[in-house]
C-alpha cells in the first residue's frame, strides 16, 4: 500500500485512519496464513523488544512473546517487580533508558499517560498492551475474528457491548468502530455510561467515517440486529467487597444470557469476550464470588460461553496474529 506505518507507536486506535487500521487487519490475516503454512518471514530479525507488565497477563504476554519470536525478534520481559518504572525511576527516565537499548517497547499497566510518556521520550515504537482507559490490541483481534467468521466487510459488522460502558475494552471498541465506520452500541446502566470525553472523541471520528455510535440502557433495543454481542468482567481484581456488591447490583440485569442473544433476532450472532470470563465455578475467584454473592455466573452465562455463538478462543488466538501485525507494521522490514 502507498503508506508507511514504520516507527509509529500504537497507543490508541483513534491515532489511525480507516486505511491504516484495515492494513493492520489485512496484515494479520496474511501473517496468520503464513504461520499456518509454516513459511513465516523474519520481519523482526535482529530486533530487541522490551515488554513492560505492571499488570499480570496471559494472552497479551504470550501474544507478544510468540509473535516476536516467530518474526525473529528477541524479547525481554519486565514484570510487576522487574523494573523501577514509576517507583524508583520516573516513566520519562525509564523511556530514555529503554529507548537506548531496545527497538520497540510494549507497556501493559494502569495509566494511559504512562504509555504516552514512553512513546514521547523513548524514540522507538511503543505499543499499548492495556491501560485502565484503553485496550487497542484487543480490538484488532475482536474485529478480525468477527470478519473471519461472518465473512462481512468490517464496516457492515454491528457490535454491541453489554455491561460496564466505562470499561477499557468498551472504550477501545468504540474508538475502533468509529475509525472503521461501523455501528457500535454500548448497552449499559445509566450510572456507567461512557465518559463525555470518550464519547465525544468517538463521535468526532464517526462524523468523518459514517460510523454510528449508540448508548442505551435498554437491553432489547441495544442488541436488536447486532452481529456481535461483547462482554467483559464487571469488577477488577483487588476491589473491595462493597465495590463488588455495588457493581453486581448495577450489572446483574446486563448479564449476557441466551435470552439476550435471541433478542438480537440474528441466528448467526456471535459472542465475544476478551477473557478471562467468570462463567462458572471452575476458578478460585468464581467460587469466592459464589460464596460471597450467591452468583454462579457473572457477565455471561455458561450456556452462552459454551454455545455455538461463542468465538472467544478463536478471538484469543487472534490476539497473537494481530499483535504480530502491529509489531511488523511499525517495526518490521515489510513496509
Curated annotation (Swiss-Prot):
<dbReference type="GO" id="GO:0005737">
    <property type="term" value="C:cytoplasm"/>
</dbReference>
<dbReference type="InterPro" id="IPR006132">
    <property type="entry name" value="Asp/Orn_carbamoyltranf_P-bd"/>
</dbReference>
<dbReference type="Pfam" id="PF02729">
    <property type="entry name" value="OTCace_N"/>
</dbReference>
<dbReference type="InterPro" id="IPR006130">
    <property type="entry name" value="Asp/Orn_carbamoylTrfase"/>
</dbReference>
<dbReference type="Pfam" id="PF00185">
    <property type="entry name" value="OTCace"/>
</dbReference>
<dbReference type="InterPro" id="IPR006131">
    <property type="entry name" value="Asp_carbamoyltransf_Asp/Orn-bd"/>
</dbReference>
<protein>
    <recommendedName>
        <fullName>Ornithine carbamoyltransferase</fullName>
        <ecNumber>2.1.3.3</ecNumber>
    </recommendedName>
</protein>
<keyword id="KW-0056">Arginine metabolism</keyword>
<feature type="binding site">
    <location>
        <begin position="135"/>
        <end position="138"/>
    </location>
    <ligand>
        <name>carbamoyl phosphate</name>
    </ligand>
</feature>
<comment type="similarity">
    <text>Belongs to the aspartate/ornithine carbamoyltransferase superfamily. OTCase family.</text>
</comment>
<dbReference type="GO" id="GO:0019547">
    <property type="term" value="P:arginine catabolic process to ornithine"/>
</dbReference>
<feature type="binding site">
    <location>
        <begin position="57"/>
        <end position="60"/>
    </location>
    <ligand>
        <name>carbamoyl phosphate</name>
    </ligand>
</feature>
<dbReference type="GO" id="GO:0019240">
    <property type="term" value="P:citrulline biosynthetic process"/>
</dbReference>
<dbReference type="GO" id="GO:0042450">
    <property type="term" value="P:arginine biosynthetic process via ornithine"/>
</dbReference>
<dbReference type="GO" id="GO:0004585">
    <property type="term" value="F:ornithine carbamoyltransferase activity"/>
</dbReference>
<dbReference type="GO" id="GO:0016597">
    <property type="term" value="F:amino acid binding"/>
</dbReference>
<feature type="binding site">
    <location>
        <position position="319"/>
    </location>
    <ligand>
        <name>carbamoyl phosphate</name>
    </ligand>
</feature>
<dbReference type="InterPro" id="IPR036901">
    <property type="entry name" value="Asp/Orn_carbamoylTrfase_sf"/>
</dbReference>
<feature type="binding site">
    <location>
        <begin position="274"/>
        <end position="275"/>
    </location>
    <ligand>
        <name>carbamoyl phosphate</name>
    </ligand>
</feature>
<feature type="binding site">
    <location>
        <position position="168"/>
    </location>
    <ligand>
        <name>L-ornithine</name>
    </ligand>
</feature>
<feature type="binding site">
    <location>
        <begin position="236"/>
        <end position="237"/>
    </location>
    <ligand>
        <name>L-ornithine</name>
    </ligand>
</feature>
<comment type="function">
    <text>Reversibly catalyzes the transfer of the carbamoyl group from carbamoyl phosphate (CP) to the N(epsilon) atom of ornithine (ORN) to produce L-citrulline.</text>
</comment>
<keyword id="KW-0808">Transferase</keyword>
<comment type="pathway">
    <text>Amino-acid degradation; L-arginine degradation via ADI pathway; carbamoyl phosphate from L-arginine: step 2/2.</text>
</comment>
<feature type="binding site">
    <location>
        <position position="108"/>
    </location>
    <ligand>
        <name>carbamoyl phosphate</name>
    </ligand>
</feature>
<dbReference type="InterPro" id="IPR002292">
    <property type="entry name" value="Orn/put_carbamltrans"/>
</dbReference>
<keyword id="KW-0963">Cytoplasm</keyword>
<dbReference type="InterPro" id="IPR024904">
    <property type="entry name" value="OTCase_ArgI"/>
</dbReference>
<feature type="binding site">
    <location>
        <position position="232"/>
    </location>
    <ligand>
        <name>L-ornithine</name>
    </ligand>
</feature>
Amino acid at each position: 500500500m502507498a503508506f508507511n506505518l514504520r516507527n509509529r507507536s500504537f497507543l490508541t486506535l483513534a491515532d489511525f485512519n480507516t486505511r491504516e487500521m484495515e492494513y493492520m487487519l489485512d496484515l494479520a490475516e496474511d501473517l496468520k496464513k503464513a504461520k499456518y503454512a509454516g513459511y513465516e518471514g523474519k520481519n523482526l530479525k535482529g530486533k530487541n523488544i522490551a515488554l513492560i507488565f505492571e499488570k499480570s497477563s496471559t494472552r497479551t504476554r504470550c501474544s507478544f512473546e510468540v509473535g516476536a519470536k516467530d518474526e525473529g525478534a528477541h524479547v525481554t520481559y519486565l514484570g510487576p517487580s522487574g523494573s523501577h518504572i514509576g517507583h524508583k525511576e520516573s516513566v520519562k527516565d525509564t523511556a530514555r533508558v529503554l529507548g537506548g537499548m531496545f527497538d520497540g517497547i510494549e507497556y501493559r499497566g494502569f495509566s494511559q499517560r504512562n504509555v504516552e510518556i514512553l512513546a514521547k521520550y523513548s524514540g522507538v515504537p511503543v505499543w499499548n498492551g492495556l491501560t485502565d482507559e484503553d485496550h487497542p490490541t484487543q480490538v484488532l483481534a475482536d474485529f478480525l475474528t468477527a470478519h473471519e467468521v461472518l465473512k462481512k466487510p468490517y464496516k457492515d459488522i454491528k457490535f454491541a457491548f453489554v455491561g460496564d460502558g466505562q470499561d477499557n475494552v468498551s472504550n477501545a471498541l468504540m474508538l475502533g468502530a468509529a475509525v472503521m465506520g461501523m455501528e457500535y452500541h454500548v448497552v449499559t446502566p445509566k450510572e456507567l455510561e461512557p465518559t463525555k470525553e470518550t464519547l465525544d472523541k468517538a463521535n468526532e471520528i464517526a462524523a468523518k467515517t459514517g460510523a454510528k455510535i449508540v448508548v442505551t440502557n435498554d437491553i432489547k433495543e441495544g442488541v436488536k440486529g447486532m452481529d456481535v454481542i461483547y462482554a467483559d468482567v464487571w469488577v477488577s481484581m483487588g476491589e473491595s467487597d462493597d465495590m463488588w456488591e455495588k457493581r453486581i447490583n448495577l450489572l446483574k440485569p446486563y448479564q449476557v444470557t441466551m435470552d439476550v442473544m435471541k433478542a438480537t433476532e440474528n441466528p448467526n450472532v456471535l459472542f465475544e469476550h476478551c477473557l478471562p470470563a467468570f462463567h462458572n465455578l471452575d476458578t478460585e475467584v468464581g467460587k469466592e464470588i459464589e460464596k460471597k454473592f450467591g452468583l454462579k455466573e457473572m457477565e455471561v452465562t455458561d450456556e452462552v460461553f459454551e454455545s455455538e455463538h461463542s468465538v472467544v478462543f478463536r478471538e484469543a488466538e487472534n490476539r497473537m496474529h494481530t499483535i504480530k501485525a502491529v509489531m511488523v507494521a511499525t517495526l518490521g522490514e515489510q513496509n
